[in-house]
Amino acid sequence: MIEPNEDLKRLIRTIPNHPLPGVQFRDITTLLGDSYGLGECVRRLADRLRDVGGHKVAGIEARGFIIGGAVAAALGLGFVPVRKRGKLPFETVGRDYELEYGTDRVEIHVDAMRPGEKVILIDDLIA
């Protein structure tokens, strides 16, 4: 029996010890470079999220922009880019977070979302 999404999983490259020893980095550039893989990834995510009732989709820099923007378009929703500290040109709000290998901060424009909006967050991974 084939596991769900096994076809997509096979398109993702694993790079051991990146960016640090002991970390298994899942490189989705191979999935993104495959027209079937990218299309199916977006279609399947959109199908699963269609009934969630989100108002917007947010994608975390940088690969979250690719998948998140495509999913937002497929769902007919607006897209909110979540950027690393200091990258957005307008006034921002942000949040610090921890990684396996350090800390960082992400920010959005202060007017990117309204109070009470339900936002679907997409990234390529969660460390």
Residue ranges and their predicted role:
Residues 1-127:
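PRPP-associated nucleotide enzymes
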